């Protein structure tokens, strides 16, 4: 099985939309795909860590840890939606506008841009 991480590497992917809902202004949820398979980022309020593995356009994200800060309820809700969606991602694509689309088997999509 050949690993194909190259399109995902290269800086922060800032989350713009989580399953059809935009993110709260001036929040900074992001993902960074590392060459060694690590996944790091911010879920909105808390940092996250995990692993990523991709083959062709399939993608598996495994979350291993998050920090445990408490933030305003709206921020925690946004963060919860993202943390719930990420482990269910099965595919990705980078569209013509450069947006990263993370898709679950149920058709939910998170959108991010560099």
What are these regions (language model features)?
Residues 1-114:
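Lipid interaction determinants
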């Amino acid at each position: 099985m050949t690993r194909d991480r190259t399109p995902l590497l290269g800086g922060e992917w800032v989350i713009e939309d989580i399953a059809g809902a935009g993110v709260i202004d001036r929040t900074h949820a992001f993902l960074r795909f590392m060459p060694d398979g690590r996944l790091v980022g911010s879920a909105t309020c808390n940092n996250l860590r995990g692993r990523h593995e991709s083959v062709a356009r399939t993608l598996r994200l495994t979350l291993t840890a998050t920090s445990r800060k408490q933030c305003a309820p709206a921020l925690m809700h946004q963060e919860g939606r993202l943390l719930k969606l990420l482990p269910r991602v099965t595919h990705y694509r980078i569209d013509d506008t450069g947006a990263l689309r993370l898709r679950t088997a149920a058709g939910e999509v998170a959108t991010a841009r560099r």
